[in-house]
């Protein structure tokens, strides 16, 4: 079913997984039993870990948290080109409320820790259960002291019982525990790492 959805999203009925690791990560995301750290190389298909669940599970909210404005721009362009419906949370749009008819919700990491976002998320969860939160370029959180103050309280993201999915192409093995701690991931978090060889 996920592979069929991949073909529809890519407009290629013969589409296949980029790598076995992408397939493994996708299966873990779709099972939704544990948190997932997907450490796949650039071009390894990380974006599909947010897109496929949103396309397959229209009655579930999928949050995509982005730590950089440039990532927001890239994702908006990519989703528009793929004709994937999405909404972007902004406190001054739609009265700060989220729409229940569009299940893929993009939010900047700095806004995702504000009270207005927490209220909007709690409200939408009553009509569109939020089941997954995907955080792109999760390794940036480890650089937060030098990077952006707003990322220092990133563990506050999981205000609802939901699966956390961290995407990155740049997490050295020695940084995995620090990243798990920063996001307060469950001890049984699935780690899918694509070899850099």
How would you describe each model-predicted region?
Residues 1-41:
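Conserved pre-motif I regulatory segment
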Residues 31-38, 60-61, 101-105, 162-163:
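Pre-Walker A (Motif I) flank of P-loop NTPase domains
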Residues 32-52, 165-171:
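Walker A/P-loop
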Residues 47-48, 56-84, 108-113, 170-176:
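Conserved Walker A/P-loop ATP-binding site and its immediately adjacent core
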Residues 71-94, 180-187:
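Conserved helix-turn-beta segment of the N-terminal RecA-like "Helicase ATP-binding" lobe
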Residues 81-116:
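Inter-Walker segment of RecA-like/P-loop motor cores
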Residues 109-113, 117-165:
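SF2 helicase catalytic motif II
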Residues 156-157, 163, 170-197:
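Interdomain hinge/linker at the junction between the two RecA-like core domains of SF2 helicases
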């Amino acid at each position: 079913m996920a592979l069929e959805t991949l073909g529809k999203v890519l407009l290629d009925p013969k589409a296949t997984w980029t790598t076995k690791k992408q397939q493994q990560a996708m299966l873990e995301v779709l099972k939704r039993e544990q948190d997932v750290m997907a450490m796949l190389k650039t071009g390894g298909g990380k974006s599909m870990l947010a897109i496929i669940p949103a396309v397959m599970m229209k009655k579930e909210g999928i949050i995509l948290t982005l730590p950089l404005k440039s990532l927001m721009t890239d994702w908006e362009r990519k989703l528009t080109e793929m004709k994937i419906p999405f909404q972007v949370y902004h406190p001054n749009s739609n009265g700060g409320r989220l729409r229940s008819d569009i299940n893929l919700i993009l939010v900047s990491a700095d806004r995702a820790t504000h009270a207005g976002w927490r209220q909007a998320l709690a409200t939408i969860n009553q009509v569109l259960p939020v089941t997954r939160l995907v955080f792109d370029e999760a390794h940036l959180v480890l650089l937060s002291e030098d990077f952006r103050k707003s990322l220092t309280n990133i563990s506050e993201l999981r205000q609802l019982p939901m699966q956390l999915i961290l995407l990155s192409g740049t997490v050295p093995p020695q940084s995995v525990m620090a990243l798990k701690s920063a996001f307060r991931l469950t001890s049984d978090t699935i780690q899918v790492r694509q070899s850099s060889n």
